[in-house]
A protein has these predicted regions:
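Conserved helicase motor core of P-loop NTPases
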Residues: 1-118
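C-terminal accessory regions
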Residues: 122-238
């Protein structure tokens, strides 16, 4: 429907789709955090590690950078039992959900059988399972392998509770929470919205401004005209 330029009835909630109207960025963030921390795990039995928050943009109150800070505070707060490392402005803590943001063919890993190999790739998502501040490394569990990161390599990791829609391409998640608030026009395209909603396997929740979704559906020509580079530059300045 969206891909054909048709407007769904966002007022019709169903078993696999819900719309929560939040016109202010702060209330949108609060709702997303509450959904991830309590409402979906308790009411729908979907654990937080099977929920993916998506946003068109990195920047702004409802962008992924701020969402990840808020979600880390709610889902993996500081604890004496969890070691952490401050890298730039980012705190990496045992238990954090992280994503590899560039191909690295030299990272050493071991699989569950103890077999060693090398290489972690852009878009791989895992969990920090060990933070060794004395030896200065993190271990990240990517489900099929555990990779070792020296602290000097932490610029290759970002938190991954919230991802941009662009970074989610090619992946699917049990539940998707989509943050929709005004950002740069070239990020609000039909293609971005279609990509976001098709990431959800069982449940999609839109949180934000319905008008943004309608604008995205109508913005088809622009999605063709702007290059990926221009979209990325717009995101960096939003």
């Amino acid at each position: 429907m969206i891909n054909r330029g048709e407007h769904p009835d966002f007022n019709e909630n169903s078993g696999d789709f819900f719309r929560l109207r939040r016109m202010q960025g702060g209330s949108c963030v609060e709702t997303i955090v509450e959904l991830c921390k309590r409402r979906l795990p308790e009411n729908m039995k979907i654990p937080s590690n099977q929920i993916q928050v998506l946003s068109p943009s990195r920047k702004g109150e409802t962008g992924t950078a701020n969402l990840n800070k808020c979600l880390q505070a709610a889902l993996n707060p500081p604890d004496e039992s969890k070691k952490e490392k401050l890298f730039g402005e980012t705190v990496f803590r045992t238990g954090d959900r992280v994503i590899q943001i560039k191909n690295n063919y030299d990272i050493v890993w071991k699989d569950k059988l103890g077999k060693s190999g090398m290489g972690v790739y852009n878009g791989d998502i895992g969990t920090v399972v060990e933070t060794d501040t004395a030896s200065e490394y993190l271990k990240v569990d990517y489900e099929d392998k555990v990779a070792l990161y020296g602290f000097e390599m932490l610029n290759e990791l970002e938190h991954a509770w919230a991802l941009t829609v662009h970074k989610s391409q090619g992946s699917e998640y049990r539940a998707v929470i989509l943050s929709l608030n005004p950002v740069a026009q070239m990020l609000l395209t039909r293609g971005v919205l279609y990509t976001a909603v098709t990431r959800a396997k069982e449940l999609l929740i839109m949180v934000g401004d319905d008008n943004v979704a309608h604008r995205m559906i109508d913005n088809h020509k622009q999605s063709r005209r702007y290059s990926a580079l221009r979209i990325r530059l717009a995101d960096e300045n939003t």
